């Protein structure tokens, strides 16, 4: 015991600048272990300067990886949420109703449904901080607290800058899918019920904020919480246009967009994460017949509303791109291809977003194999990735 304390004391004598240069060059998994060495090390590693230096140093060495989630809907309310990456060979259940061991997941066309809103890309500038996903046993040795809760319900999730936010048994949970860690946010003070909870990221101040919408009367109240801030608490903010929120959200360059409904029409609401201001960005385009089944994606740095049309022999997707917020000007892009491209998966495709290369990413609703499609509009070519 005395020898261990002596070794730890000798580590604290390493100059901070030298220690900084050593740690910033290590893999993310090793850096995470060093959080336990001492308070000095933990403070430095969690500091904003170290995080930014670490990401800028390590990001060129990493390739974008695909992360997606599956919900075992055969269990009805007895659900399990599985996360996979391109290198994962065995699934890891992260949201089991019953933590008892179970058989490995076997994909079945009608047994598992792709939850498209959970599939996103790990950002280049953040993914190096997240532990590499490797094959893990089906039973997690140290499960997060919320895994043992009963009446488990996985609600609409949002994925931003490496973290996920969703409602779990009425509580708001922030989850890091790469390392399997989660936190439960402070209880929000409201007389109503939580309608939606969206996660946003401010790249200038490197801050995450949660926008919680509660259904008190006919319209929603809005409260904001900053993650990681000292004495952080929920703050009430106002919107000049009363509205009721939809399900879809998207964060681009510090602006969180989400669909909403006013007394007269469907709108796109804009939340400035840094300024904590809310306003209606635009009404939905007139050519969009229905807001049901829409998706919000980042289309070359602009927010786009995606709707799909059903046909027997081809897939049609309408991309409504918000070109000018002040003029509420939208452009329309039609994406169409024959079902022969996707073979047995033509039962239904979803647009999941865009890749770092600007490709539009599709995935089937029902499947027998894990497959993702990438459409390059410039070359008009489609490639598939079988996981």
Swiss-Prot record:
Cited PROSITE patterns: FBOX
Boundaries of every F-box domain copy: 8-54
Matches recorded under Pfam families: F-box (PF00646), FBA_3 (PF08268)
Cited NCBIfam families: F_box_assoc_1
PANTHER family assigned to the protein according to its UniProt record, in alphabetical order: BNAA05G37150D PROTEIN-RELATED, F-BOX ASSOCIATED UBIQUITINATION EFFECTOR FAMILY PROTEIN-RELATED
Protein name per the record: Putative F-box protein At1g47800
The organism of origin for this protein: Arabidopsis thaliana (Mouse-ear cress)
């Amino acid at each position: 015991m005395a020898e261990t304390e002596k070794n730890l004391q000798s580590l604290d004598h390493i100059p901070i600048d030298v220690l900084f240069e050593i740690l910033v060059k290590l893999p993310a998994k090793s850096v995470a272990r060093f959080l336990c060495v001492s308070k000095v090390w933990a403070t430095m590693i969690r500091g904003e300067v170290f995080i930014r230096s670490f990401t800028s140093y390590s990001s060129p060495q990493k390739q974008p990886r695909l992360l997606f989630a599956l919900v075992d809907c055969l269990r009805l309310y007895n659900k399990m949420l599985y996360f996979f990456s391109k290198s994962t060979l065995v699934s890891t259940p992260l949201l089991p109703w019953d933590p008892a061991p179970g058989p490995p997941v076997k994909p079945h066309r009608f047994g598992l449904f792709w939850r498209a809103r959970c599939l996103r890309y790990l950002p280049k500038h953040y993914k190096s901080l997240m532990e590499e996903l490797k094959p893990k046993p089906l039973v997690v040795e140290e499960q997060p607290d919320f895994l043992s809760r009963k009446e488990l319900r996985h609600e609409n999730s949002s994925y931003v800058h490496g973290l996920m936010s969703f409602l779990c048994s009425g509580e708001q949970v922030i989850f890091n899918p790469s390392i399997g860690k989660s936190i439960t946010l402070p209880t929000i003070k409201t007389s109503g019920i939580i309608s939606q909870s969206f996660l946003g990221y401010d790249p200038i101040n490197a801050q995450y904020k949660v926008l919680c919408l509660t259904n008190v009367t006919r319209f929603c109240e809005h409260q904001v919480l900053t993650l990681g801030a000292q004495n952080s608490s929920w703050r009430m903010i106002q919107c000049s246009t009363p509205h009721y929120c939809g399900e879809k959200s998207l964060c681009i360059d510090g602006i969180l967009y989400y669909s909403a409904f006013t007394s007269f029409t469907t709108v796109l609401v804009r939340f400035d994460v840094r300024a904590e201001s809310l306003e209606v960005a635009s009404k939905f385009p007139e050519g969009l017949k229905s807001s049901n089944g829409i998706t919000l994606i980042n289309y070359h740095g602009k927010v786009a509303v995606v709707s799909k049309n059903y046909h027997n022999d081809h897939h049609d997707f309408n991309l409504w791109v918000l070109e000018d917020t002040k003029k509420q000007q939208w452009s329309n892009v039609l994406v169409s291809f024959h079902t022969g491209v996707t073979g047995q998966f033509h039962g239904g495709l979803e647009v999941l977003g865009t890749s770092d290369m600007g490709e539009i990413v599709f995935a089937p609703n029902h499947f027998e194999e894990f497959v993702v499609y990438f459409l390059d509009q410039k070359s008009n070519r489609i490639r598939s990735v079988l996981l």
